[in-house]
């Protein structure tokens, strides 16, 4: 479906605005997916979570990590690590022992916190106010003031973000404001699919024609 949609856009000269969340996640994945430090940190977080089960420190355990769309769901895990690092000096001796891996990754945690905070800023700006030359300008300023001042990995991510914004800017008219988020479609379809069948393996192709119907009654 996605490939066919792209072909139609090219065939009929329609401009196609990429979904902001998926696009930013893709850029992060290109930089961090095969990065040794990234893999080590999240592996240790997963091991620590298993060790916390049924112990007195279980209330401090990290959030569950997503296997699919991992780079679209980093914020919760990164925020947990950042907060735990800030409070590490207040932990008990046992708690410090269980989460002893965190201080060793302090620099990396700060790096990831800056990345996900920047992504959060861009997503909020775009989803609340739409994609426009004004919101693009605000996002550019934020990227240049934050992750472009970081290390080599952060600058690679930031450069990809800036390139993406420049490409989207070139498709916009001066006063044009467009939607570049598929959240509404995904939520509507996800709710309908769950109601139709809680089985996650249930095929979705036969349900596609029902979408116009549910959308037509959405506001009634």
Region roles according to the model:
Residues 2-11, 18-220:
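Acidic/histidine-rich catalytic cores and adjacent linkers
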